[in-house]
Amino acid sequence: MAGDDLIAKFQALGMSEQKAKETLKNANVTKNLQLSLAAAGSATLSDGTGMLIYHMATKLKPQTADHLPLLVRYIVEHKLDNTQRVDAALEYLLKCGQSLNANIDLQALEKECGVGVVVTPEQIERTVQAKIKASYKEALLEQRYHFNSFKILQDVRGELKWADAKSVKAAIDVEIFDLLGPKTEADLKPQTKANDKPKAAKPKAEVTPAAQTAEAASDGATTISELMKTKVHFHAPGENFKADGYVVTEHTERLLKEHLARTGGKVHTRFPPEPNGILHIGHAKAININFGYAAAHDGVCYLRYDDTNPEKEEEKFFLAIKEMVEWLGYKPFKITYSSDNFQQLYEWAVVLINKGLAYVCHQKAEELKGFNPKPSPWRERPIEESLRLFEDMKRGKIDEGAATLRMKVTLEEGKMDPVAYRIKFISHHRTGSDWCIYPTYDYTHCLCDSLEDITHSLCTKEFQSRRSSYYWLCNALGIYCPVQWEYGRLNMNYALVSKRKIAKLITEQIVHDWDDPRLFTLTALRRRGFPAEAINNFCAQMGVTGAQIAVDPAMLEAAVRDVLNVTAPRRLVVLEPLKVTIKNFPHAAPVQLEVPDFPQNPQQGTHKITLDKVIYIEQGDFKLEPEKGYRRLAPKQSVGLRHAGLVISVDEIVKDPATGQVVELICTSQPAEQAEKPKAFVQWVSQPIQLEVRLYEQLFKHKNPEDPNEVPGGFLSDISEQSMSVVVAFADRALNQAKVYDKFQFERIGFFSVDPDTSANHLVFNRTVGLKEDAGKK
């Protein structure tokens, strides 16, 4: 049917011309509408019937497509006379759809959809009156027209399922008017939210970029638990057939029942990394989605090592992966290995060959690459011959690269016959030399999912094209078939996560190792001081959608700052010390001051610092010639000392004769309560200890260091010379007891974490993130 004819027919359903043209671009909806029009025949499609057919066509899933004529008939006969009834019919048919050619109980269908049920205006009025009287009258009298009447509507619809929503809303409005009368001037004013009122007892909340993102993104949440419970809507265990694209066979119903009997109806997920590198920030999203979804639904999550590439796997990667999963706060239900199933996978490969669904092929690896590789000349090789050759592959009788086992299936993107097994004469870290044939990802992944009764196989979007082979393989073997769900990958700007390229950075001595704090591996983020909670919250803010996400590091840092702001105790540190001698020091000897760890919440703990006549402030907190708006110490401007109760003023400036640099200030002090209030207070230390402080910035200059258009010279040419600097800082002695990975806020500077290079006599700190910039701070 020509495009113009279809547009005209779509308009006859009740669409605008623009809507009809947009619909034509959707091949699936167009197909459903064409079939619907054919099924409707000469029936009159007016009074909204046509748009109900359109609604059905957009919602119809492949599992229920066979029932399209039935749905059209019920719509045309006005048995399904609103979208609510159409949706109920689709849901009911989907439940029946796990069996092929399922016989539909029409009486049950009509009951489920409320066919013939008429809710009269009198019923609606009586129900609304009863609900308001029983549950809402007091609140209405108190809040008047500011009350959210949607609560009443939901309550009434819960009792009168098939009542027309507009009629219910109208009845509610009438009852509220009868109760309250006309709106007053106060009713017309916007309501002040409770959380808008200032609270003296609590500091003003800081709105961070991360918080803004979480608020703005409807698919995000503040925590993983909230995200998985409120924003993610996957199928229930055992209802795999409801998922889009799920393939139903004559065995599906039986297999799902057996699956539910084994799992007890619990959610089963898995996190299946390859143990050939260190996990990075993108993996953190995968960990949170898989473990988080299971935890939110009282399920279990496996940690499964996809160890099918023996030449790339190392023991240190196995250990590091487990360590990072646990660091993020998750405990695997079981730790498994794809190699645990090598024997079963081999036996299933033999089954495929016997069914004529797999064959031994001798095309070289380079012949299989590209968009249109030549079809295999061995595709129709006799089953007995493939069985014999596959056994020869297993016994090491065929050279590496001389043969593969391929599956007879075409993937979604058109790729034909993916490889299931290849020959590798390499010892495996777990199975030793037992095997010289190893299964591929395409073959292994879905079968291990099936063996572990995974309910939700959650993976990134690039695996969507493998979904067809995933379902095909499970169904070809007649085993339980999980559901694969894809979500968008998380990418970080100004960063690299490629294992090969990070290894290059290490060998070129640009970074020190996989845990260099300038990287975005999880070990690096931990070393830099990022709390696991912050990484988890950041992943929650990103949501679970099909869109690929690329964010700046500042967004992750904002989530880190949110957590550290309430968990990192404060300490006084100066990075570039300037000596200050208080000539009228008000005490005969050094004094101990008790300082709160969290000034805004003193009840959370305190620590002691020493105040003596010689202190050190930041060099940047003194200026000989201050510019306009400068607020800190200057020859004619005093400054307060944080926590000391003193205000100091400059009396004398001591300079290095050789360089002219200021090396000491001689100051006088006044008690803060007697002095004129200074414009600023600065941090200081006295009788300090020394720290090595490593200050980190972005490693790369450009947002996409791998993009040849942005960085023609390659990522190695894009390294920032200022990505790391080291200073010797002075700190109060309370930091003497700090342990590796302890986190602190150095007041007015930023958040810092104790580095593993720390020893008994040498404290090393990494800057985690700076403080939020305060506009106008001078």
Swiss-Prot record:
Coiled coil: none annotated. Keywords: Aminoacyl-tRNA synthetase, ATP-binding, Ligase, Nucleotide-binding, Protein biosynthesis. Disulfide bonds: none annotated. L-glutamine binds at D306, Y441. Transmembrane segments: none annotated. A motif ('HIGH' region) lies at residues 273-283. Residues 188-219 are annotated as: Disordered. GO terms for cellular component: aminoacyl-tRNA synthetase multienzyme complex; cytoplasm; cytosol. It holds the Pfam family tRNA_synt_1c_R1. Residues 188-205 have a biased composition (Basic and acidic residues). ATP binds at residues 274-276, 280-286, 460, 489-490, 497-499. Its EC number is 6.1.1.18. A motif ('KMSKS' region) lies at residues 496-500. PANTHER family: GLUTAMINE--TRNA LIGASE, GLUTAMINE-TRNA LIGASE. NCBIfam families: glnS (TIGR00440). This is Probable glutamine--tRNA ligase. It comes from Drosophila melanogaster. The gene is GlnRS.
